[in-house]
A protein has these predicted regions:
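Arg/Lys-rich, positively charged N-terminal/basic patches that mediate binding to nucleic acids
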Residues: 1-34
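Basic/aromatic recognition patch in beta-strand/loop cores that engages polyanionic ligands
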Residues: 39, 46-77
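A general structural signal marking secondary-structure boundaries and capping sites
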Residues: 22, 26, 48-51, 90
Length: 99
């Protein structure tokens, strides 16, 4: 089954800030971060139930090579995946779902 992806503004902002940070560390590293992030989102789109639930309705997937998680909600009845956050693992976990 094909699921639609919706990426919330918060997640886009987090990706943009992280891309800039990594680009300052090494030219091209920011692009690699974005590539790995979208690779993770694509995997989520194919296998949305693969990752465990937390807080009753959210799931999270680790981004390869970077200390980030893609936090998402799977709306099974609508065949929709909503990316809530691209979350750095050093941050307070309570911040994952804040807007």
């Amino acid at each position: 089954m094909k699921y639609t992806i919706e990426i919330r503004d918060k997640a886009i902002e987090e990706m943009d800030l992280s891309k800039e940070y990594y680009h300052e560390k090494r030219v091209g590293l920011g692009d690699e971060f974005i590539k790995e992030t979208f690779s993770t989102i694509k995997y989520i789109q194919q296998f949305p139930l693969h990752f465990h639930l937390f807080d009753k309705k959210y799931r999270q997937a680790k981004i390869d090579r970077f200390p980030f998680l893609v936090v998402y909600e799977f709306e099974e009845e609508d065949n929709n995946i909503v990316v809530i956050s691209v979350f750095h693992t050093s941050r307070n976990p309570k911040e994952k779902l804040k807007k």
